[in-house]
Amino acid sequence: MTATRNVKGLLGTKLGMTQVWDENNKLIPVTVVQADSNVITQLRNADVDGYVAVQIGYGQIDPRKVTKPLAGHFEKAGVTPRRHVVELRTADAAEYELGQELSVEVFEAGQKIDVVGTTKGKGFAGVMKRHGFHGVGASHGAHKNHRKPGSIGGASTPSRVFKGMKMAGRMGAVRHTTLNLTVHAVDVEKSLLLIKGAVPGARGQVVLVRTAVKGA
């Protein structure tokens, strides 16, 4: 499948959240993402690969910890080994060059973006925390049922639990995309993106910031 739109993207590290004042003297909560040392490690084309994309590497890693096939891959691109690699399907892939460095200048203030990351892991959680169940009354005969899920299905009919039943289980630590966030400011000197609102993941989490796929 050939990409039909131009997509810009960077990998970065979530540094945390803070708040800044805007031009209307309103306090805006922002997430700070540091996106330095992004480099093009491979170019995909329709003739060889069947699709058009750019591969971006991010984050330094000890060369001794890189497998020989990956070491050869990075050497071919003329770059030092990178810890994280991601592909972006974009129609303008031919305009990039192997080894080209990318900076936060690919984004501008006011631009709509999507942020992809891994959410915080919560461990094994009950239905009230995991799915927002209201639980049972705190008194009046609710004996040790306060946080229980209730019925999960019939007995002889259907004599099974339907797939997708909301039950207790491991919560978080899943890949999540937050759509249509806004870039509040770009600090080129420090390679920082200030993004309005929250993005998935804990401090220190690697996230992908890309052009929004929906909306403006």
From Swiss-Prot:
The record's Gene Ontology cellular component field reads: cytosolic large ribosomal subunit
NCBIfam families named among the record's database cross-references: L3_bact (TIGR03625)
Q: Record's PANTHER family?
A: 50S RIBOSOMAL PROTEIN L3, LARGE RIBOSOMAL SUBUNIT PROTEIN UL3C
| Protein name per Swiss-Prot or TrEMBL | Large ribosomal subunit protein uL3
An MF annotation (GO) of this entry: rRNA binding
Q: Which organism is it from?
A: Arthrobacter sp. (strain FB24)
Write down the PROSITE patterns for this protein, in alphabetical order: RIBOSOMAL_L3
Q: Where are the annotated segments for Disordered?
A: 137-158
Q: How does it assemble?
A: Part of the 50S ribosomal subunit. Forms a cluster with proteins L14 and L19.
Q: Does the keyword Aminoacyl-tRNA synthetase apply?
A: no
Show the InterPro entries listed in the entry: Ribosomal_uL3, Ribosomal_uL3_bac/org-type, Ribosomal_uL3_CS, Transl_B-barrel_sf
Q: Name one GO biological process term.
A: translation
Its biological purpose is as follows: One of the primary rRNA binding proteins, it binds directly near the 3'-end of the 23S rRNA, where it nucleates assembly of the 50S subunit.
Per the record, the similarity remark reads: Belongs to the universal ribosomal protein uL3 family.
